[in-house]
Amino acid sequence: MPFYLPRLTRREFLKRTALAGAALALAPSSYAGIFGKSRDRHTFVFFSDTHIAANPAEIYLKVNMTDHLAACVRELAAWPVKPAAVIVNGDLAYLFGKPGDYATFAKGIQSVRPIAPMHLLLGNHDERENFWRAFPQDTVKVKSVPQRQAAVFSSDRANWFLLDSLDVTDKTPGELGAAQLGWLARELDLHPTKPAIVVVHHNPQFPKVTTGLLDTAELMDVLSPHRQVKALIFGHTHDWQITQHVSGVHFINLPPTSYTFKAGRPSGWVRVTLAPDGMEIELRSLDVNHPEHGQVKQLKWRAG
């Protein structure tokens, strides 16, 4: 049963913020501009691997994860148009998916709520039950795969398939499982004409899986013959890169909003704008002096 956070209206947002006494990533005066902006229905924003701890002062690998998320939110709020949706691709919590982690995460994304609806995926540092209890007020539950957070949503130029690769909390590899793969195959059969983009936390890994998606081969057995599948978007590695599978499916490895494992690699967020025959993708690095910051790449869809 996936969770989806609908966009808050101005009245809902201001009322909720006042009642909660929430600390916001933006000054109150900034919100007037947000509510007045137009929406680009073809643009989507991706955050990944936020790793928010209960203690907002927590630091790991010299990075304050809460501060990094706040910086991403501020830049998103300053963007000239509002995206169609914001997708946060797993590892929302720091290590063990504790209730306090999600409480701090919820505060961190509060300023996103009036900007766009949000889809939240899970990674290996999340804990499903704690996560599901963290947003009781306004989550929309959709039936899909029992005990998995999988969903399909449609936009003008693509259908989006959101998967749940959380296997065991704080164990590095992930797994979709036969039930979820079967569900995905059936949903792809039901959505044959529009381009399909699949989003999952764990990275596909070849030929031997040690830290990524344990059923990578089984996933590609589903994706490759469904020619409407054009891209697989994932996180987990904390290493921004774009490659292409032999089948023609684009592999997009999101940067973390938090920390990187390799020196010199960017952290930040990604803007995706869909075209009829592909996508434009831009890295927004938190380090504006990073050589890849602001780079825009054009991806063309495979045939079929």
Residue ranges and their predicted role:
Residues M1-E12:
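N-terminal secretory signal peptides
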Residues L8, R16, Y31-A103:
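N-terminal active-site segment of His-dependent metallophosphoesterases
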Residues L19, H51, L92-A93, H125-E127, ...:
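Catalytic metal-binding/acid-base residues of hydrolase active sites
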Residues F35-G36, K98-R186, L190-H191, P195, ...:
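Extended active-site neighborhood of metal-dependent phosphoesterases/phosphodiesterases
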Residues F47-S48, V86-G90, M118-G123, L163, ...:
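Active-site neighborhood of phospho(di)ester-bond hydrolases with catalytic His/Asp-centered motifs
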Residues L92-A93, L166-E175, P204-K208:
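Surface-exposed cleft-lining segments at the edges of enzyme active sites
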Residues H191-P207:
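Short acidic, glycine-rich surface-loop motifs adjacent to enzyme active sites
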Residues G278-G304:
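Acidic, His/Gly-rich catalytic cores of divalent-metal-dependent hydrolytic chemistry
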